[in-house]
Regions:
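Iron-sulfur cluster-binding cysteine motifs and their immediate structural context
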Residues: 202, 217-241, 246, 250-268, ...
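Helix-enriched interaction subdomains in cytosolic or periplasmic regions
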Residues: 1-37, 232-269
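Cofactor-cradling patches in redox/metallo enzymes
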Residues: 128, 329-386
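A contiguous, basic/glycine-rich beta-loop/short-helix subdomain that forms a polymer-engagement track
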Residues: 262-282
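Short hydrophobic alpha-helical runs that function as membrane-insertion/retention elements
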Residues: 84-87, 317-318, 340-345
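Ferredoxin-type iron-sulfur electron-transfer modules and their immediate structural context
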Residues: 2-224, 283-298, 375, 381-482, ...
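Non-catalytic interaction/regulatory modules that flank or connect domains
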Residues: 314, 321-335
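Short helix-loop-beta junction
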Residues: 77-81, 303-315
């Protein structure tokens, strides 16, 4: 079986502010030729391309095994005459038993097998069906159908329920459950033959990821919002399938550490390009309207509609995925002097396409969190507003949303920030907020409490229960928890804390609790604070400090009833360092301790 490769073709890609016309005119936002990407006029940082290869081997999954379902599937095969098609009827009842495989007069092979699993993407769909006989194993239908790779390139699912049930199904798979959808699906699949390319939309740094450490579970934000099922959990991190990823960008927006970043365009490119657009306008830009487009024609139509309704001081920016622009981008624009940002999630007002998914809801939560931080600085409420769709109500109220021209506005007279922090999400956000705090008069606020799930905060600790075992330090992925090096201390840097919860999971004493908040003073936030410290315990022989007194006392108390520590000399060894303990054992007896021999019990 041949697997398409994630090729490392560097390309200067345009998506973000002027969507690629060639990519958007393609049936599934895929590009057939590299040249189509290189022609773009708006440049961003290099990214790689993901390649798909389709030979046109299509599997049609019928809606049952009765005559009507088979007839519908055969009509689809006829409509896709340019493809090599097979039909799978997953229902084969005892009342109407059918042979496992039959050939129609038109030469179409129909399989009557139980469908167990369907996974993959354009050019590589693996279809597993139940094996014949009493053996409950699975067989690969592509191998039975003798396709070249043992896989199917395309799948048309006519069943009542989608076999691949995700918000954004993979390229090459279409679920159609009504006549119009079936007709459109046949037309689209017929065009999906050949080689296709799309950008690799993401960059992932495992070392920054707070998903898991040492088989402990922490942050799962990206998994919770992924609309394609492209993200999966692995040991000490996550894994993203670039062939399933469709670039919605929500994973990067909700990532607390910046381990997941959007690459098409990168955050730094998006911020710099937006600043250039702000500076290129003949008059001051006080508002931004960020809206999604899927093709060049739609971009023009939507832009004309929006621009006709927006005041002159508002800049409309077209983006292929508005969900990829998160709190670091919004805060940077506010620091650049923008007084209102509206983000449109869906270009269409169609009820089915505007159903709020986990990513849409997460975007609203991110905006709400940043609005709380900005309002605490004395700025107006709801400076960032998420709009679900461009319906009549939204259109009618656009002008009112951007009534921010007042000379008394808190941002009036504040210089525009122009920092660049090279895709460091947390540093970018803090730099933007620091800039606002330095120039706003109402900057006496020390901190603001945030809702659960926020990526900023501190830790509270039960000092009486903490033994300074440092399990939390070894687990923290962000360097927020530190040991005292030569002294028994637990230190904490609030600016680094992701509130991922890995430290709480690792703590054997359950003494750590998270307190989400934003600390405005960056000096204090970056200063290491002592959470707990104990008196060091010195070895009773060599006097070297090797533990804390509390740890030795706890250990002595817990082991005092154990049969191996019934003699005073055994308990005494607990108060020795590792070197002196070994010396003492072999000094006392040449044979050492027989750990298998229990002392005699008193009669």
């Amino acid at each position: 079986m041949t697997k398409p490769t994630d090729t490392d073709h560097p390309t200067e890609s345009p998506v973000g502010f002027a969507a690629n016309p060639a990519a958007m005119s393609d049936p599934l936002n895929l590009v057939r030729a590299r040249a189509a990407i290189d022609e773009a006029s708006v440049k961003t940082a290099s990214t790689s391309l993901v390649e798909y290869r389709s030979s046109g081997n299509c599997l049609v999954i019928a809606n049952g095994s009765d005559a009507d379902a088979i007839d519908q599937a055969l009509q689809c095969v006829a409509a896709m005459s340019d493809l090599s098609s097979w039909i799978l009827c997953p229902g084969n009842t005892a009342e109407q038993p059918r042979p496992p495989r039959e050939l129609t007069e038109q030469g179409v092979v129909i399989f009557h097998r139980q469908l167990l699993k369907l996974q993959g993407h354009l050019g590589q769909f693996d279809v597993q069906v139940a094996a014949l006989g009493e053996n409950p194993s699975a067989e690969h239908l592509g191998v039975i159908a003798t396709t070249e790779t043992g896989l199917f390139d395309l799948v048309l699912d006519l069943g009542g329920t989608a076999t691949i049930d995700v918000q954004l199904p993979p390229f090459g798979y279409i679920h159609a459950d009504n006549p119009d959808a079936v007709e459109n699906a046949c037309a689209q699949l017929s065009e999906m033959v050949g080689e296709f390319q799309k950008p690799k939309y993401f960059d992932y740094q495992q070392t920054l990821c707070a998903h898991s450490r040492s088989q402990l579970n922490g942050c799962s934000n990206c998994l919770d919002v992924c609309a394609t099922g492209a993200i999966s959990s692995i040991t000490d991190g996550i894994e993203v399938d670039p062939f399933l990823c469709q670039g919605c960008g929500h994973c990067a927006t909700v990532c607390p550490s910046g381990a997941m970043t959007y690459a098409y365009p990168s955050p730094a490119t998006a911020i710099d390009s937006s600043r250039d657009l702000l500076n290129s306008e003949s008059q001051a830009v006080l508002g931004i309207f960020l809206y999604p487009v899927t093709d060049e024609e739609e971009a023009g139509d939507a832009g004309d509609t929006v621009d006709a309704l927006l005041p002159d001081h508002v800049l409309s920016i077209a983006a292929e995925e508005t969900g990829a622009f998160g709190i670091d981008y919004w805060a940077s624009m506010i620091a650049a002097g923008v007084r209102k940002i509206c983000v449109l999630q869906h270009a269409s007002d169609d009820a089915q396409s505007t159903v709020a998914g986990p990513g849409d809801l997460a975007l609203v939560e991110q905006a709400s969190m940043l609005n709380q931080i900005l309002h605490a600085l004395g700025l107006p409420e709801n400076m960032i507003e998420i709009l679900p769709s461009l319906n009549d109500t939204v259109l009618a109220g656009l002008t009112e949303k951007y009534q921010c021209e007042s000379a008394d506005h808190p941002l009036a007279g504040i210089p525009a920030a122009s920092f660049s922090l090279h895709n460091d999400k947390r540093a970018t956000l803090r730099a933007a907020i620091d800039h606002l705090r330095d120039h706003l008069p109402d900057n006496a606020v020390k901190h603001i409490d945030l809702p659960d799930g926020s990526p900023f905060g501190r830790l509270s600790i039960d000092n009486q229960g903490c033994t300074l075992c440092m399990a939390c330090v070894s687990t923290c992925p962000a360097g927020a928890l530190l040991d005292g090096q030569s002294v028994p201390q637990l230190r904490f840097i609030e600016a680094n804390c992701l509130q991922c919860g890995l430290c709480s999971e690792a703590c054997p004493e359950n003494v750590l609790d998270r307190e989400p908040r934003y600390l405005f003073d960056s000096v204090d936030a970056r200063q290491a604070q002592i959470l707990n410290e104990e008196e060091p315990f010195n070895c009773i022989v060599c006097h070297k400090p090797f533990a804390t007194r509390k740890m030795i006392d706890n250990m002595s108390g817990k082991l005092s009833e154990h049969w191996m520590f019934q003699e005073s000399k055994a308990l005494r060894r607990l108060k020795m360092c590792e070197d002196c303990r070994v010396k003492d054992i072999f000094t006392e007896s040449e044979s050492g301790i027989d750990v298998h021999q229990k002392p005699k019990q008193p009669s």
